[in-house]
Amino acid sequence: ITPLQIIDFIVDIVNPKNNETIIDPTVGIADFLSVSYVKSNGTLDDKNFYGVDIDEDMVKLATLNMLLNGDGNATIEVQSDGLGSINSKFDDEGNLIKLVPRTEKQEHNYNGLWDNRVDGKQLKKFDIVLTNPPFGEARSWVPNTTDLGIAECYELWNRYGQTKIDLGVIFLENAVRVLADNGRMAIVLSNSIASIASHKEARKWLCE
């Protein structure tokens, strides 16, 4: 859980404006979204808030949190496949769509090609991403055989070239790829991603 003082600080810096779309890909109880709405004194469009979580109870609490703070129109979805927003993204109509792993004949969404869709649907890009995802060595992702194709949709998974990866790294790429051009992002991550040698690929990728 992110302390409210930190959330307040981050929202003040990012400073969401009217007509901007906002997402928390690991929404929890939607504190980032609710604080953004409250701080705007209701001037932000309540239809422009989006969130995803793997826990149905969290999504219920998030929806209630937004409602109690005056936003009854936020789009907050549960994706209880254990992957949440790692695999599921919003399309431009506000519906969840899944990444498509490569096949022998098609690259599909392999290695960050998330806009390469044969179904004609377009990935929704957001003006603002605010999130505090799971991260750290204890929260490493070790994809099973079924999920490996999804992992390969992430360029950083392929760059790291290991059998496991810090979830914070995956959620970092996830946040960047759903961010609109000239958008603003705030993500709470471990200091290690910004400093230690084993995460140099993440830093290099982010600066490219």
Question: What are the roles of these predicted feature ranges?
Answer:
Residues 72-74, 150-153, 208:
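Short, surface-exposed linear patches
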Residues 119-121, 177-178:
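Surface-exposed acidic, glycine-flexible loop patches that form ligand/cofactor-binding
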